[in-house]
Amino acid sequence: MILVIDNYDSFTYNLVQYLGELGAEVHAVRNDAASTGELLDGGWDRVVVSPGPCTPREAGISVEVMRRFPEAGIPTLGVCLGHQSLAQAFGGTVIRHEPVHGKTTEITHDGTGLFEGLPSPLTVGRYHSLVVDPDLPDALMITAMGGGVVMGVQHRELPAHGVQFHPESVLTPEGKRLLRNFLAEPGTD
């Protein structure tokens, strides 16, 4: 079962739908409806932290989820705000950026993990006004870049990934394949 942390964003249920279409059983919980400790006891196979309209500090349990679930060995994916929450959880910085909403960008990636088997460059849909500072802490590595912005990060030792773009958007034609790669990652199931 997949836990989706809902950061009060309209894209959350696009993620839920895509994951369901890929055969996953999905349960969404608002970022202020339960504690991370309560959710850690839920027997989740994977966790996705959704996009949202705020900063990571304002996103309820999102930053804590992006740290504690991977530390428990549970594969975790952050999308947009979730990606920023991952960076912040491990000592990275989130900075303001010129707003980009409903635009496509070509990104280049490392071809591993989430990006395995996907074309590079890859067309992705962007909706954000915050980004992860590329000066990352040692625990994190950049897996994708586009338009001068960090578009993907991964923890070097834990099963934690983040993407700045929206794989659940129609503007990301290969988004469902990326989510399939996340579901295929070895985990606790």
Region annotations inferred by a language model:
Residues 35-43:
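Short amphipathic alpha-helix with an adjacent loop that forms part of the alpha/beta core around
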Residues 42-116, 179-181:
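Cysteine-nucleophile active-site neighborhood
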Residues 5, 121, 162-173:
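Phosphate-binding/catalytic loops
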Residues 170-189:
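Acyltransferase
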Residues 17-25:
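Two-component/phosphorelay signaling modules centered on CheY-like receiver
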Residues 111-157:
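Catalytic beta-strand/loop cores that center a nucleophilic Ser/Cys/Thr
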Residues 25-31:
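Short hydrophobic/Thr-rich beta-strand motif most characteristic of the beta2 strand and flanking loop
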Residues 1-3:
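Extreme N-terminal starter segment of soluble prokaryotic enzymes
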